Amino acid sequence: MITSIDIADVTYSAKPRILVPYKTQWEVASHLPEYRKLAERVEFYKYEMSTKDDFVKFLETHRINGFWLTEEFFTVLGNPSSYIEFFPASLKVILVPWVGCDFIDGKLLRSKGITLCNIGPHAADHVTELAIFLAISCFRMTSFWEYCFKYVENGNVEQCKKYISSDSYEIVTDSYHGQEMKFPSRTDKCKPNKDRKVVHLAEKYTVGGKKMESPMNKKVLILGFGSIGQNIGSNLHKVFNMSIEYYKRTGPVQKSLLDYNAKYHSDLDDPNTWKNADLIILALPSTASTNNIINRKSLAWCKDGVRIVNVGRGTCIDEDVLLDALESGKVASCGLDVFKNEETRVKQELLRRWDVTALPHIGSTVADMVIKQTLITLENVQDIFVEGGDGKYVLN
């Protein structure tokens, strides 16, 4: 039986064809038996990326039924949205092996008969792990201590202890880039010994004037209460006995679906939504309604010394306002895995602050996730191209 015919430079196969782009890394767990079994029914077309022009020519001359996106695609060829007008009529689905899809217009795809699928709620555990790490860092100032221990005091534990109860700063030079930055002073450098007073640590357990405390028994406001937000709430409640409050754009979650008590807030313009939180965690997508949710007005309603974690999207925070709030102490510290302008250059003022834990968008970046996202994307492929369904996790 003939299953493919070569015409010019184009090979037409009888199987549904799933485009999988790569250049220097292969992001699909193709060693899995599930992949190999499904490869008997569909063709996983490995496309080696080169230039944007070459990719456009490829789209114009090849039949593609599915497009399995990879992170490397963004690095090499840019946003896939810029190629929508070149997508062949045969394209039936865009397969996104992660959660966030705000980089592409799902409604526009649907108007062209293209389904947009992601991996549903299956990244929640790994993003939650990072959110908890960032929350701990915010309360315990672990990023400051690590930097201080490794690069300032060169492993001298006793010298590190001299930062406790400090409330003044000095300008130091970043050992990596040679840039100046503000950094807490050691207490033995703040004043001459004869002028120093005995410090009551129970009242002033601070570094740089900012309190170090346990996350136990605190109140958290979670903005965005889908699968990730709910999982974060569950873990913070179980591990730290935190009181959970949340905002969800589509309304409250049924209490029977949660294994903990959580207070719902319906209005972000109500000061009562913000006033009790010791910690705010953002797990929101990037939309017009979530843009700059953390702003001057919302922070004014917060407690002094509130702490902020963002594992959603960088567009949700007005970064200039956040910097001002960190400087004034309105925000004690923050943990950020996402930023504005990630495609170009993240705001350097944030990266140089001692009270910011900054990570390069690694919410679900673990080896386990490569396996998991492959298996779930295969479920979408199986449902659409073998079983004739619409896809397991459809977004549009």
Curated annotation (Swiss-Prot):
Residues noted as binding NAD(+) in the record, renumbered to the chain: S227, I228, V311, G312, R313, D337, H361, I362, G363, S364
Annotated keywords: NAD, Oxidoreductase
Active-site residue list: R313, E342, H361 (proton donor)
InterPro entries per UniProt: D-isomer_2-hydroxyacid_DH, D-isomer_DH_NAD-bd, NAD(P)-bd_dom_sf
One Gene Ontology term, aspect cellular component: cytosol
Gene Ontology molecular function: glyoxylate reductase (NADPH) activity; hydroxypyruvate reductase [NAD(P)H] activity; NAD binding; oxidoreductase activity, acting on the CH-OH group of donors, NAD or NADP as acceptor
Top class in the EC scheme: oxidoreductase
EC number: 1.-.-.-
Induction: Glucose-repressed.
Family: Belongs to the D-isomer specific 2-hydroxyacid dehydrogenase family.
PANTHER family: 2-HYDROXYACID DEHYDROGENASE YPL113C-RELATED, 2-HYDROXYACID DEHYDROGENASE-RELATED
Role description: Putative 2-hydroxyacid dehydrogenase.
Name of this chain's protein: Putative 2-hydroxyacid dehydrogenase YPL113C
